[in-house]
Amino acid sequence: MFPAADDYDINIDIEASAVDSLLDVAPSDVSSPAELTFSRNVFIPLTTACRYTCSYCTYYDVPGEATLMSPEAIRDVVETGVDAGCTEALFTFGDKPDDRYTKIHTQLDEWGYDSIIDYLHAACEIALDEGLLPHSNPGDITQAEFRRLREVNSSMGVMLETTADVDAHSGGRRKTPGQRLNTIRAAGREGVPFTTGLLVGIGETWFDRAESLLAIRELHERYGHVQEVIIQNVVPNERSDFDQPSVDTMRRAVAMARAALPEEISVQVPPNLSPTGDLIDCGVDDLGGVSPITDDYINPDYAWPALDELNSIADDAGLPLHERLPVYDRYLPEPVRRGDVTPAADPVD
């Protein structure tokens, strides 16, 4: 049973034989993809406040220093993204920031919002008004909050990271696997197209990685909502001395993901963090959201690759590169799916 699973009534039964089979998977056991995809986005860090203090994370600021973007600043970034040809507005913030940070709560109240969820809803409406599709990563939220946010989001996400209880999640407020699995389940119950994934190298074992992938698979088999799984390596930063996983470790982890997950779920690696070219033949078929105008605020020391670099990665692998929306085709109405769109007729004078 996963840590804190009983607290959230998580009933996921993973057979030891399934874990053993997955641990036997090697990169040579999986196939290369038919294509590579990516989404062009703007990264909007709604607030840098978070109730957690995970030791590998540089995203959060301590109380008194955390920022909250204004509606005007959000609109400015969104408009710039539209001009740059982006289709996705990626909204991020830490778990329940208005719970721990008095300043953030006070500012939201002054602007007329009862909670960060209310404010996220309004921010997503700004993106929609300007022509971008929101994808929100709001941390652990309730099923009712998913129900409300689905109205204004094309897709959403939260990283499972691991089903293990690792020291990297230590602190006065500890992130638990049961809590994360509950969030992924809540999204499924509300039919929210969802992104999740593993963070490799934070103290978990190979058994934990296999178990985590199988837990994601089981939740997807119940609800059909997982559109992609990210296999992300931890990177060194000012708060962490974790060693970056080796290429061989990442190749094996990606291959295990491809073998564990149904074909319709994409396996993604972040091209600014991972040795992407070395991972494609292990089953990677998506390069995630890449921004031509904003930083990766979660990993600010690692710049996004330019579109030309993505094309080079695809060319070196002998694969076509296609831009996608933040929500995958199978969750869209049939008339607007990528392969089914009829070109507009030429204008008539």
Predicted regions and their residues:
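Conserved Radical SAM active-site core
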Residues: 63-221
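Canonical Radical SAM [4Fe-4S] cluster-binding loop centered on the CxxxCxxC motif
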Residues: 36-73, 96-97
